[in-house]
Structures are given as C-alpha cells and as structure tokens.
C-alpha cells in the first residue's frame, strides 16, 4: 500500500476521480468503521490500520507519512468529526421504533410517523393520538419524522442541565451550574450559544476559504508539474537530437564522447523526471485530502446542530488550519531544462584539431555587446564560454564558479601590472560589496518571512517598502556594473589577441564575472518578487490586527511626530515656561493611527495614553544626549 492507488495519473480528471467519497475508506472501499486520523490528515478504518504500526510509528498507506502512535493498540485516536458525519449520514436509513408501542417504522413510513421535538421521542400515528390527546400536550411541537429538528437541546453530562453558554477560551459547552462554578476571569470568555454559533461559522468560513485557495494552488502546481514532465521529455529529445547531429560530422573522433554525453543527458532526465514525479505524487495525495475536507465541512455544516457544531467545529477549524500551515511543495524544485553542454565537450574533444588552424579568423569589429543585443563574435575559436545573450532579463543563470575565484587569485598573485589585472582588483571590491548587500537583503526577507509564517508577528508595511526600495536600487547598481563590465569587452579583446593561453584564462574569468552578476541580479529579482507578494498580506494582517486588538493602533509615524516635537521645542529653549507648554502640547494624543477604519474616541485616547511613556522615554533619552542644553528641558 505505497500510494499505488494514485499511480495512473493521466491528468487532473484522474486526480478528481481518485478522491473518492469522503465517508468511504480508501483501503477497504467501504463506509468508515471507527475512522482513525493520521498526522497527514488521511482517515482509515480501525480494522484497516490494525497491525501496521512498527516501533511506535504508523506509515500512511497513501503518502507514507510517519505517524507516532501510543498505547498497546498501536492505533491513532478515533476521528470524532468523521465519526459524527458517519453516524449522521446513517440516521435517515436506520429503523425507528415508536417510543410508546415499540412499533418499528421504516424509512418509507417517515411521513406517517411523527416526532415530538418537545419530548424528543418518535411516535407512530396511533400513539400520537393516544398519548398527546390531553390539553397539556397541546403546546408540544409534533412534526413528521422526516422533518424533525436537529436542534435538540442537549444536557450537561455532569449536572444534567441544558447547555446555555459556550466558553470561547476552553472551547466547551456550559450549563448554568458550570457557568456558576467558573472563575470571574473565565466568565468573560463565555457567550450564548447563538453568538458562539455565528462566530464559529465565520471562523469556519475563513478556514474553508484558505483550504480552497490551497486547493486551487495545488491544482495549478499539478498542472505545471505535468507540463514540466512533458517539457523534460521534449527537452531530452531535442538535446539528444542535437548531440546526434553534431556527432555525425565528427563520428571518428568523438565516439567515446558521444556515449558519455548521452549518458549525462539520460542521468539528468532520470533525475529530473524522478524529482517531478515524486513531487507530483505528493501533491496528488494532497489534493484528495483537500477535497475530502471541503466536503466534510459542507456536510458538517448541514448536519450538525449548534451544540454539535460548537463541540466539533473548532476541532474542524484546527484541522483545516493544520492542513493549510503544513509545508507543501507547490513550486518545482528545479528547472525542466536539460543541458549537457555538448558543444563545449565536443570543443574540448576537438581542441587538438582546432589548434592546428589559424587563430585569428574573426575580426574584432562589433565586439561590444549590450544588455538587449546579440552576442559579439569571439576573437579566437577557443573553448571559452559563450557571451551571454539577453541574460539580464531574468533567465536562469549558473551559480558563481569556484574556479573563477581561484583563477582570479592566481592572476592577481602574479603581480603583473596589466589593464585586466587592474580591472579584476576593482571588480572584486565592487562585487563583494554588491554580494554583501544582496545577502543582507536575503537574510532580512527570510527572517520576515519566518516571523510572518511561523510566529504570526505583526510586520510594518514600511519595512517591506524599505526592502523593496533597497532591492530596486541594488538592481540598478548591478545593471550599471554589468553594463560597465560589458562595455570593456572590446578593450579586453584587443589584449586577448596577443596570447592564446592568457586569453583562455582571462575570458573564463570574465564570463564567470558576468554570470556572477547575473546570479546576483536574479537573486535580487526573486527578492523583489517575494517582497511584492508578501507586502499585501502583511498590510491585510496589520489591518485585521488593528481592528481586533486596539492596542496595536499606534500613530502613523511615531518617530516623525517625535522629531516634529523636538523641532517645536527648539525655539523655546530660552524660555522655560515655553518648554513646559510645548511638552504638554506634545503629550496630547494624536488622532491618527494605522487603522484604516475609524475607531471610537474612547479606545483611541486609551491607546495613545498607553503610548505616552514611550514618547516621554524618547524625550528623556534625547535630552540626556543634548548635554548642558538639556537642562532647560529637564527644568
């Protein structure tokens, strides 16, 4: 049972068909019997999982995720939510007996059998007339059995009193005696059942929207991965065709190299194909889980009463939140391009033959290259790296080669005073500065992303704007450095004509420098994309935080206001009375806040009074650093 039911994946339609019924076990294909929930949110019957645990760990038959199990049974706990849905789905098909005469009524007799919502008992037609004939039963709510209400008042298991309250802190139903036994602090979290039901429905709706968004993203990721698998197949075919075409013209000298290149392509294809299919299998097992839980939510809302909703609804919300917050690999881990660098390999193989001909066969006219233009012709027919063509547009580039650093160090260690040596010294300094700035931005964005996803911290939108501004400025600097480096190509090509050996080393270093700048710019572009994607969520979370917790409503620019207060107090240094008046004026609350929604005057003043110690502390710190001039403010 290693996920074989998801093996024949031919498209999204196959994934939809593999989802199955939410109340049917994927192993035995029957209705759940005491369903057990694993850590991967897959459910199975108790009998289907019995005996599968090994060393306290239970592998999911679908996705192979390990679940820790405790106890001698070796089974996870029973899924109360799914068990409720199973029991509720069978209510309509179960035989009902009259509470008075024990007459069994089938489902076909649902219209001729009655149910007293007041008594909470089913009655046949004859017993209804006999037992509820008296006037004292006139107010009883008697309906047809098929129309009976599910909002039956449940009673507390401890005090046998009806539930009237719900604790939002402990997520539990309370009767009047449970409410009286609670402490005063806990009573503040108690609301009536109707209000708790409305709040719970709103929170469940938000959780369902998050799951639907994840479902949409998963479908898009699956479609992308399926297309990339096809692209890998086409790319491998194209690469093999190119290798065969080049091999045909040099068959005698490159027979061994041909086999090596084909083996390289095949290994890359197998690696990428395996990686994409593994990720596709993982997402294929995730999509049915999302669909099943969405159906569970819909069924739960239609079947559960208010008390049952409050009893199991928060468990459902936690489960949905757990599904959404789990790490899901929705983006491809690598590209679908297969590159064997066959031209360079063939050039190395034919290097002895190429060295026999004349070295200077191409002139240096038009050697300069622009960011958007084509590649310039190489001076020599050497196995050096090709000039980049339009790579600054964001296409994938290679990572910095360690060989470039070693070659640069060797070149600088020779101590020769040449134009290229001076260029390398200047380039290394500027490149290190750009690399440090990019790394700092990467670390800052990673830290903010971790705080946002794991710690759910409130991040100011100004921080994201500053990161975006620095990223755009850094992109301009890298583009300028790249253009400056590209503009020196013609100068260096004239020098490279003097010696082939020196040209081979210098060109390799030069192209590696260009690739390093391309890598830096690509990383910076990724930072810019991530920052733009995170910024709307941070602003949205900030607005929600400000509305839910007024203590987060601080002035728009506390530092700017503080600086303005300092500026206003400067003319009053010669007048002690003016200083006191200015300080009193600066301590008045400001009506602006980060919240977009207008708030009542009371909470706003309280929030700003809460911030006064911070402003006063800032004033004291500024006065302490002003030396003797601060004596006027301290007075």
UniProtKB/Swiss-Prot annotation:
Pfam families: PML_CC, zf-B_box, zf-C3HC4. Residues 553-635 are annotated as: Disordered. It comes from the Eukaryota. Keywords: Coiled coil, Cytoplasm, Metal-binding, Zinc, Zinc-finger. The keyword Transferase does not apply. GO terms for cellular component: perinuclear region of cytoplasm. Residues 589-598 have a biased composition (Polar residues). Residues 422-460 form a coiled coil. A zinc finger (B box-type) spans 93-145. A zinc finger (RING-type) spans 25-64. The keyword RNA-binding does not apply. It is found in: Cytoplasm. Residues 553-562, 607-622 have a biased composition (Basic and acidic residues). One of its GO terms (molecular function) is Hsp70 protein binding. Gene3D superfamilies: Actin interacting protein 3, C-terminal domain, Classic Zinc Finger, Zinc/RING finger domain, C3HC4 (zinc finger). One of its GO terms (biological process) is positive regulation of membrane repolarization during ventricular cardiac muscle cell action potential. InterPro entries: PML-like_CC, RNF207, Znf_B-box, Znf_C3HC4_RING-type, Znf_RING, Znf_RING/FYVE/PHD, Znf_RING_CS. Zn(2+) binds at residues 98, 101, 127, 132. Plays a role in cardiac repolarization possibly by stabilizing membrane expression of the potassium channel KCNH2/HERG, or by assisting its synthesis, folding or export from the endoplasmic reticulum, in a heat shock protein-dependent manner. Interacts with the core-glycosylated, but not the fully glycosylated form of KCNH2/HERG. Interacts with DNAJA1 and HSPA8. Interacts (via the C-terminus) with HSPA1A; this interaction additively increases KCNH2 expression. This is RING finger protein 207.
């Amino acid at each position: 049972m290693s996920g074989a039911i998801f093996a024949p994946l031919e498209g999204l339609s196959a994934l939809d068909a593999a989802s199955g019924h939410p109340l049917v076990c994927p192993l035995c294909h029957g209705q759940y019997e005491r369903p057990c929930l694993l850590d991967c949110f897959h459910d199975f019957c108790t009998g289907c999982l019995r005996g599968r645990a090994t060393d306290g760990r239970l592998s999911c038959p679908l996705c192979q995720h390990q679940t820790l199990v405790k106890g001698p049974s070796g089974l996870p706990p029973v899924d109360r939510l799914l068990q409720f849905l199973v029991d509720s789905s069978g209510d309509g098909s179960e035989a009902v007996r009259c509470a008075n005469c024990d007459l069994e009524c089938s489902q076909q007799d649902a219209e001729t059998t009655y149910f007293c919502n007041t008594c909470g008992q089913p009655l046949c037609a004859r017993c209804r007339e006999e037992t509820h004939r008296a006037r004292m039963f006139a107010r009883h709510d008697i309906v047809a059995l098929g129309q009976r209400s599910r909002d039956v008042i449940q009673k507390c298991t401890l005090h046998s009193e009806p539930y009237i309250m719900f604790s939002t802190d402990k997520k539990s139903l309370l009767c009047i005696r449970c409410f009286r036994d609670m402490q005063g602090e806990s009573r503040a979290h108690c609301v009536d059942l109707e209000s708790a039901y409305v709040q719970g429905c709103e929170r469940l709706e938000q959780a369902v929207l998050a799951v639907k968004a994840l479902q949409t993203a998963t479908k898009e990721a699956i479609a992308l991965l399926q297309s990339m698998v096809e692209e890998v197949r086409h790319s491998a075919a194209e690469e093999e065709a190119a290798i065969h075409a080049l091999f045909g013209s040099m068959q005698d000298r490159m027979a061994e190299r041909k086999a090596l290149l084909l083996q390289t392509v095949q290994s890359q294809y197998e690696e990428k194909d395996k990686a994409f299919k593994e990720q596709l299998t993982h997402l294929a097992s995730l999509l049915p889980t999302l669909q099943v839980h969405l159906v569970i939510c819909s069924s739960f809302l239609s079947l559960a009463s208010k008390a049952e909703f409050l009893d199991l609804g928060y468990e459902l919300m936690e489960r949905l939140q757990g599904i959404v917050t789990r790490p899901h690999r929705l983006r491809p881990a690598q590209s679908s391009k297969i590159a064997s660098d066959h031209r360079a390999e063939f050039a190395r193989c034919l290097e002895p033959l190429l060295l026999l001909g004349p070295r200077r066969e191409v002139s240096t006219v038009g050697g300069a290259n622009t960011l958007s233009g084509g590649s310039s012709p190489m001076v020599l027919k050497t196995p050096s790296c090709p000039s980049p063509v339009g790579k600054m547009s964001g296409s994938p580039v290679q990572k910095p080669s360690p060989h470039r650093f070693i070659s640069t160090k060797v070149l600088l260690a020779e101590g020769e005073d040449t134009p290229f040596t001076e260029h390398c010294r200047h380039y290394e300094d500027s490149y290190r500065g750009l690399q440090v700035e990019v790394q700092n931005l990467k670390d800052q964005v990673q830290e903010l992303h971790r705080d946002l996803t794991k710690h759910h911290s409130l991040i100011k939108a100004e921080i994201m704007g500053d990161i975006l501004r620095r990223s755009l400025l850094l992109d301009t600097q890298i583009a300028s450095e790249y253009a400056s480096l590209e503009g020196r190509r013609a100068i260096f090509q004239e020098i490279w004509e003097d010696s082939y050996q020196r040209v081979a080393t210098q060109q390799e270093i030069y192209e590696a420098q260009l690739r390093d700048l391309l890598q830096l710019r690509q990383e910076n572009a990724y930072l810019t994309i991530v920052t733009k994607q995170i910024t709307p969520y941070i602003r949205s979370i900030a607005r929600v935080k400000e509305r839910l917790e007024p203590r987060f409503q601080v002035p728009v620019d506390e530092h700017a206001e503080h600086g303005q207060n300092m500026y206003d107090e400067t003319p009053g240094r010669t007048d002690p009375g003016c200083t006191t008046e200015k300080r009193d004026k600066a301590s008045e609350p400001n009506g602006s806040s980060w919240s977009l929604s207008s708030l009542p005057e009371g909470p706003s003043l309280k929030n700003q009074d809460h911030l006064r110690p911070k402003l006063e502390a800032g004033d004291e710190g500024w006065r302490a650093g002003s030396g003797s001039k601060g004596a006027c403010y301290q007075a």
